[in-house]
Design a protein with these regions (language model features):
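Hydrophobic residues in alpha-helical segments
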Residues: 28, 105-106, 126
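Charged C-terminal helix
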Residues: 112-147
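Glycine-rich beta-alpha junction loops
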Residues: 23, 61-65, 84-87, 119-122
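Short, small-residue alpha-helix embedded
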Residues: 88-111, 115
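Conserved phosphate/ATP/ADP-binding segment of small-molecule kinases
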Residues: 1-78
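Short, charged, surface-exposed loops that flank catalytic or proteolytic processing sites
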Residues: 32-41, 106-116
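Short pre-catalytic strand/loop immediately N-terminal to key active-site residues, enriched for Gly-Thr
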Residues: 78-92
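Residues on a specific face of well-ordered alpha-helices
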Residues: 5-8, 12, 47, 99, ...
Length: 147
């Protein structure tokens, strides 16, 4: 609980946050079970994160109709991005996603225009990796950008 309170305080200083759905629910104390969550709930969660001080929000990992969805939310924009879902658990995917977001911002790219590119890049690289039973990791040594 202390750690979550600390993260909530940090929201006042963040220009952008990239929580997965679980993290976003914890940060906002949203009162629905995971299985009850719909797109409109995620938009409410993003609005609440915005009211807590963050300018731009990317909520990752919302599964719907065998797609993996990301919500981009800012003051004037609510936009959904979809990607095919690969039926495998990969450790570190969210971290790589956030790093690629940061990279796009440093390059001066418009975030809204970069999200689909980032999702496609992750999908293509995860799809090419060897799959093992249990939890897998992103194999960065095999990660290809711009092939």
């Amino acid at each position: 609980a202390k750690q979550i309170s600390f993260y909530r305080e940090l929201l006042n200083f963040a220009d952008i946050v990239t929580p997965n759905l679980t993290e976003a629910i914890l940060l906002t104390e949203y009162n629905k079970t995971f299985s009850e969550i719909k797109r409109e709930d995620i938009e409410k969660i993003a609005k609440k994160l915005s009211e807590m001080g963050t300018k731009r929000i990317l909520i990752k990992s919302f599964e719907e109709k065998n797609l993996l969805n990301t919500l981009y939310f800012s003051k004037n924009i609510i936009k959904w991005f979809e990607s095919k879902k690969i039926d495998i658990k990969i450790c570190g995917t969210g971290d790589v996603f956030s790093s690629l977001v940061a990279s796009e911002l440093v390059k001066g790219e418009h975030l809204e225009n970069s999200i689909q590119k980032i999702q496609t890049l992750l999908f293509d690289n995860i799809e090419k990796q060897e799959k093992y039973e249990g939890l897998n990791e992103i194999q960065l040594e095999n990660f290809k950008i711009g092939e």
